[in-house]
Design a protein with these regions (language model features):
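N-terminal secretory signal peptides that target proteins for export/translocation
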Residues: 1-2
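Thiol/disulfide oxidoreductase modules built on the thioredoxin-like
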Residues: 97-105, 112-157
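N-terminal "domain-start" segment that seeds a small globular fold
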Residues: 18-42
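Short pre-active-site segment immediately N-terminal to redox-active cysteine/selenocysteine motifs
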Residues: 48-50, 54-58, 124
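Conserved redox-active cysteine motifs that mediate thiol-disulfide chemistry
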Residues: 54-71
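Conserved segment of the thioredoxin-like fold in thiol-based oxidoreductases
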Residues: 26-28, 64, 71-114, 119, ...
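Hydrophobic beta-strand anchors of alpha/beta hydrolase catalytic cores
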Residues: 51-52, 83, 128
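Bacterial N-terminal signal peptides
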Residues: 5-16
Length: 162
């Protein structure tokens, strides 16, 4: 009984830590087409804190998270915060249609061949990577549950102060 309880406690601790982890190393560079048809490059944003959010319209947590990402963008964009939402679906038309109903003002990029999501080793939807001003990856989040946006805000504020 004690062994089973110990395994359960360890499992809960590991699971609670799995959704957010610190990272080190340079963020892989990429250039993708935005919904406006522009080419957007991560390298062009060096000097800003950048959130790269991988999402899909079929992902319910991704859709739940989107308004919170918009609020974060509105609050911190003028302070040097950028947000790139990378849609990973084969056909971007579904994402375009969904975005008509859920407007966001940050850049939405399309990765229909999943090349960028593979560079970032995306294993869950949504996955969110925070990149510091110097271009290094600092945090990664796998999945989304209500309340995660508070952790995003804490991490974005810390990176903006660096």
């Amino acid at each position: 009984m004690l062994r089973a309880f110990s395994v359960l406690v360890v499992g809960i601790l590991v699971a609670s830590l799995a959704w957010a982890a610190q990272l080190t190393g340079p963020a892989p560079g990429f250039t993708l087409t935005s919904r406006d048809g522009d080419q957007v490059s991560l390298a062009e944003l060096k000097g800003n804190v950048v959130m790269v959010n991988f999402w899909a319209t079929w992902c319910v947590p991704c859709r739940q998270e989107m308004p919170h990402l918009q609020a974060l963008y509105e609050r911190y964009n003028s302070l040097g915060f950028e947000l790139l939402a990378v849609n990973v679906e084969d056909d971007p038309e579904g994402a375009r249609a969904w975005l008509e109903e859920t407007p966001v003002t940050f850049p939405v990029l399309f990765d229909p061949k999943n090349e960028v999501s593979q560079l970032y080793k995306v294993v869950a939807m949504p996955s969110t990577v925070l990149v510091a001003r110097d271009g290094t990856m600092r945090f990664i989040h796998h999945g989304y549950k209500p309340g995660y946006e508070n952790e995003y805000q804490t991490q974005v504020r810390a990176l903006l102060r660096e």
